[in-house]
């Protein structure tokens, strides 16, 4: 799946006429249907400068149908945190989380829990034991996901190496629910309502009713693209409304750590990679739920796929 994206971005390079590029992408998307290694592929949508230049569904799927975008939803939770900060509901990335979640802290908590910040959760540098991969099932089988996550032993110092954990984003969802006074889904639908074409469908909740930050969110490829377009425009909608603060988009795309699996940088809910001569920022979800944004030179176009 990664090679598919690299091929797409290469075709979307800025070396030939836009019309020729558009035709190349359409041809490529058609050819993907016959590739055995891409049989799980459901849909691909590619846009350039806000215009969809090619889209295709495979094996009966369509770009308008919802699917579980998995961890790509972490980028959406990051946007909600940025909006909450802009609204004064949160102080900023350096705000400590312990006072916000004091009811769920362990009775004999490691003192380092008082050092974890909002930014640490966003960049996967909380230091707490990971609740992803082989530990995920044990976590979501617990009676209280927030308390279970906060009770994990520290594997590193807060602000240390990247420890990718869906629990970190879930703690952000719990914090948003508390400071926003509404469920995270209600906040998302209210705050991101101005984004044309964006819609969250079903979304799993924990036993306390908190929406699962960072997983189990249903969305269509077109809707995910609409979110990508919002970030392409530095948080501004097509009609000029500033939904996500522009400086938050820049902060989110600034690498703070790196994946030990790929070496790609990681900011606030977004991965970063250099492909060819382009900086690429992407939301990643298990099973190939991907949103890529390629940022060229200032006088070039901007692709989202």
Please name every model-derived segment.
Residues 32-61, 291-292, 300-302:
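A short, well-structured edge-of-sheet supersecondary motif
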Residues 50, 67-93, 121, 172-176, ...:
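Active-site SXXK
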Residues 87-126, 151, 180-215, 219:
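Active-site helix/loop module of the DD-peptidase/beta-lactamase fold
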Residues 246, 250-303:
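Active-site Gly/Thr loop motif
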Residues 2-13:
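Bacterial N-terminal signal peptides
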Residues 18-20:
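Boundary at the C-terminal end of the N-terminal hydrophobic targeting segment
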Residues 63, 132-216:
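Catalytic-site signature segments of enzymes, centered on catalytic residues
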Residues 168-175, 215-236, 289-305:
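Active-site-proximal alpha-helical segments within enzyme catalytic domains
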């Amino acid at each position: 799946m990664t090679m598919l994206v690299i091929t797409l971005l290469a075709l979307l390079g800025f070396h030939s006429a836009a019309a020729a590029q558009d035709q190349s992408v359409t041809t490529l998307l058609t050819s993907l249907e016959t590739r055995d290694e891409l049989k799980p592929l459901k849909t691909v949508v590619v846009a350039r400068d806000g215009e969809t230049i090619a889209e295709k569904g495979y094996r009966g799927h369509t770009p308008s149908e919802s699917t579980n975008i998995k961890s790509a939803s972490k980028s959406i939770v990051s946007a909600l945190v940025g909006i909450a900060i802009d609204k004064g509901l949160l102080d900023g990335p350096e705000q400590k989380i312990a006072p916000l979640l004091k009811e769920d802290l362990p009775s004999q908590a490691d003192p380092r829990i008082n050092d974890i910040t909002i930014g640490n959760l966003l960049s996967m540098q909380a230091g707490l034991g990971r609740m992803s991969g082989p530990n995920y099932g044990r976590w979501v089988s617990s009676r209280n996901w927030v308390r279970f996550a906060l009770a994990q032993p520290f594997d590193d110092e807060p602000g240390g190496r990247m420890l990718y954990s869906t629990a970190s984003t879930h703690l952000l969802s719990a914090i948003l629910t508390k400071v926003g006074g509404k469920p995270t889904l209600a906040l998302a639908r209210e705050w991101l309502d101005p984004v044309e074409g964006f819609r969250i469908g079903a979304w799993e909740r924990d036993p306390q009713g908190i929406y699962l930050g960072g997983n189990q969110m249903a969305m269509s490829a077109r809707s995910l693209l609409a979110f990508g377009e919002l970030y392409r425009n530095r948080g501004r909608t097509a009609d000029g409304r500033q939904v996500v603060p522009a400086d938050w988009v820049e902060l989110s795309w600034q690498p703070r750590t790196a994946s030990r699996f790929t070496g790609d940088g990681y900011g606030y809910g977004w991965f970063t990679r250099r492909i060819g001569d382009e900086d690429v920022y992407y939301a990643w979800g298990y099973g190939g739920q991907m949103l890529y944004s390629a940022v060229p030179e200032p006088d070039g176009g901007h692709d989202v796929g």
